[in-house]
């Protein structure tokens, strides 16, 4: 696992109901499945791209 300096916390704030299947898959890739869940991920360009794809469903809680 990466050190704490390269981690980002993401919280799901929106429902994937009636969303495109690719947006649902992106939430699964971000390890999110219910509103209010928070996950800590490595801060990489790939993860940032996934967050940008579903920016209306998630928010960044903490950037270290």
Curated annotation (Swiss-Prot):
A GO molecular-function annotation: structural constituent of ribosome
Keyword Ribonucleoprotein: yes
Keyword Ribonucleoprotein: yes
Coiled-coil intervals: none
UniProt keyword list: Ribonucleoprotein, Ribosomal protein
SUPFAM superfamilies reported for this sequence: Ribosomal protein L30p/L7e
Example of a GO cellular component annotation carried by this entry: cytosolic large ribosomal subunit
Pfam families in alphabetical order: Ribosomal_L30 (PF00327)
UniProt GO BP: translation
Family that this chain belongs to: Belongs to the universal ribosomal protein uL30 family.
Oligomer and partners: Part of the 50S ribosomal subunit.
Name of this protein: Large ribosomal subunit protein uL30
Record organism: Rhodopseudomonas palustris (strain HaA2)
